[in-house]
Amino acid sequence: IDRKIYTYKFRKACENADKIIAISECTKRDIIRYFNIPDDKIEVVYQGCDVSFTHPVTEEKKEEVRKKYQLPDHYILNVGSIEERKNILAAVQALPMLPQHIHIVIVGRRTGYTEKVEQFIKDNGLGERVHIISNVPFNDLPAFYQLAEIFVYPSRFEGFGIPIIEALYSGTPVVAATGSCLEEAGGPDSIYVNPDDITGLAGAF
């Protein structure tokens, strides 16, 4: 019922609006497809990220964050709520194909899906190589990005993908999923893989 009410309200808002701002071309296409809104009524305005990600983090701050969270020397980073559509399990499934010294650090809010990820970690003996960290203060996040070797975002669906922008501003290479808007966020210099292609994801790393 909630979904039907939300859909009705969204449709009415789109119909009554003089102009609609979409956060990506992908979102614009969805609005046109699902709500039959004219193309010329919608403008795309991409999102940015907080300015703190555009500045180098001091070595002192990096060392403080590394010690505080016991971060490994070489890790692939993911930032975002740990939920099914964000598909972080795919990156964890790729980890056994990578050298032993490579770890994955997942920063985000836990959901029921986290248990599925943790079960795979347990079943495959990856407990020493996967680090799930929640409740990280915002001012520590830039150091997480700048200490990482790679940022991974294998999400199946996003409206835009701000963490990709944060990673790019941090100078961290991005591997993301095809199929939604992430190629818009990451641009031509990131690597994109089918979110179901675990071997391809490992190869991209």
Stretch-by-stretch model annotation:
Residues 1-205:
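Carbohydrate transferase catalytic cores enriched for Leloir-type hexosyltransferases
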